[in-house]
Amino acid sequence: MGPRSRQRRTGTVQSTNDSSSLSKRSLAAQGYVSDAFAPLLVPGIVRRTPLIHRGYYVRARAVRHCVRAFLDLTGAIRSPTRAQILSLGSGSDSLYFRLKAAGLLTRTAVWEVDFPDVSRLKAKRIEETPELCAQTGPFKIGDSASTLCFESSDYRILGADLRELQRLGEALDSAGLDATSPTLILAEAVLTYLEPSRAAALIAWVAQRFPNALFVIYEQMKPGDAFGQIMLQHFRRLNSPLHGLELFPDVEAQRQRFLQAGWTTCSALDLNEFYRRLIPADERRRVETLEPFDEFEEWHLKCSHYFILAASRGDILSETPVFLPSEASFQIDPALPSGFLSASVVTSDHQHSSLQRYGHTSVLLSPGIIFSAGGFGEQEGRHCRVSRFHLLSRSCDSEWKGCQISTLGTEGQWDGRLYHTMTRLSDTRVLVLGGRLSPVNPASGALQLDIYKSEDNCPEGQNVVVTKAALEEGSMLSCWRHSTTEVYYQNQRYLFVYGGRSVTDPVLSDCRFLHVETMAWVRIPVQGSSPEGRHSHSACSWQGGALIAGGLGASEEPLSSVFFLRPVSSGFLWESIHIQPSITPRYSHTAHVFNGKLLLVGGVWIHSSSVPGVTVISLTTGLSSEYQIDTASVPWPLMLHNHSSALLPEEQQLLLIGGGGNCFSFGTYFNPHTVGLDLSSLGLGQ
């Protein structure tokens, strides 16, 4: 690497460090963690989003867990030498200061290594900040030619390149690091920025150099799915490509990577498992109520694409595992796939007429017309709550075409709600219930949408009239992520509204019935054991009742249960459907009944490293089977959450409409076109 390339590399790393450090500062400012030193080390004030806060919180807790485990282990033994923490690629991290202030460094010292420019800048900030100097005690600042940028009795900062191992070893020796002492080597999002051969050399070098060591890394994984592809694209755009993910795509591959490099033991968890297993429930509840939050899909996907790993060598650090095993396995993998369902793009519409949004709702008005409204998407070159309606239509056997349609007149306007429901009342009329404008602002009232055709019957010429639905007063439905299902009782048509969440309730278990003919809320007796509250579940009409499947429960954990609200003479009866083999808990999916089978399509799950496809459940036997979606013919990442879908039973096809999400800090992604799933393999005999 030449001087210019090295300089560009250092600048990119500095930019990455600055962004991460600002996120950590924002994390502390909002009360997720206690860190009085982050603001002193990181200039500037930025308030990150709740999603970023949660992502950095679980990262901080995972690293904290490993550091505390190391300090507990080394503190319990009598050693003639002090324990050591060696932080690689430490940037502006405040670890030393937090440990020192907590009194946890009485028998431990800290060494940090980063690029020279990064390390010198940190040393200068410490020198200029009295509160930081008070923690370090007397110190020395190295000259510009020295790799040792800062030195105190228990803290040293070095400027060195992790790819130059011989020089790194010499610098650590000169800085007083004792290779024989128990040592924690910490690398937060570091190895992945090294080329695979360089990272392998570093892992082996550390194993050979430190006979009593714990190596902890926090990094990305799972590059192959849609979220992983967006993640890779993001870092490529930053000129900081992620290396080695294809070689080590999951936690088991990462474990074998370290074991084969000379480490005695190694364990690793993705951050969903770490969060649910190793953070106490009361602490999780505290964090989950710090800020209004409604990006569960992206939160869980982020956690499934990062892992924390601890590899150890030597008798001292290998006897006690850092991640104690749990009594019950966290993994709930789906059954082996019974087959594949081919996916293909069914629209060729231009960008201005495509449906690029998520959190919307779609309704099949007639076999050739699908109407969509709401959601967050792209409109007039910016990302926003979408105000325009979308019509997907075709005539005879022609291809599907999409178009944007507008509101007619000035009496009513679409309010831009998300996570609402829409129900077809006729070929030209739709009822909208619930939804939200923001996590603290529910949508106001029910809406009636009337679609008016143009004189030439051209889809582009159609208009929508928005009016307040004439529901009885005092019946405000202030929830979102709920379901609305058509059911029948005493030969009368009702809409069954179930579940969801609100500003005050993280989950709802309410059952409400709207009489369609009179638009009045009515009370109908419901017997049986009620399902636990949930949101982001699916609901389908079947045999006059409703099938409720999956969803996210009160503890923000996906559910696997399937219930049938069965019509009976006295009202309705909740029945639990026994499924074999049991299915992986999921939410944010869609569902349809097809040929006597319940199809659960896409969604998000946290208990398996695979990607949800289509789960098929026989409604007569309860037998389930799994089908993967073959996306080889889809030329872009297909994200199947926050989407909508429409079943075309006569054609044995399912249309997947919209979908995507705000992919952590990697950018917002929208599925650009409508995709069709071929269901012909799920015939009556399957």
From Swiss-Prot:
Q: Where is this region: Disordered?
A: 1-22
State its role.
Probable S-adenosyl-L-methionine-dependent methyltransferase that acts as a component of the wybutosine biosynthesis pathway. Wybutosine is a hyper modified guanosine with a tricyclic base found at the 3'-position adjacent to the anticodon of eukaryotic phenylalanine tRNA. May methylate the carboxyl group of leucine residues to form alpha-leucine ester residues.
Q: How does it assemble?
A: Interacts with RNF144B/IBRDC2.
Give the protein name, as stated in the record.
tRNA wybutosine-synthesizing protein 4
InterPro entries xref list: Gal_Oxase/kelch_b-propeller, Kelch-typ_b-propeller, Ppm1/Ppm2/Tcmp, SAM-dependent_MTases_sf
In which pathway is this protein known to take part?
A: tRNA modification; wybutosine-tRNA(Phe) biosynthesis
Whether Transferase counts among this entry's keywords is yes
Key words of the record: Methyltransferase, S-adenosyl-L-methionine, Transferase, tRNA processing
Skewed-composition ranges (Polar residues): 10-22
UniProt keyword annotation of Methyltransferase present: yes
User: Into which family does the record put it?
Assistant: Belongs to the methyltransferase superfamily. LCMT family.
State which Enzyme Commission number(s) the record gives.
2.1.1.290, 2.3.1.231
Chain sites annotated for binding S-adenosyl-L-methionine: 59, 89, 114, 161-162, 188
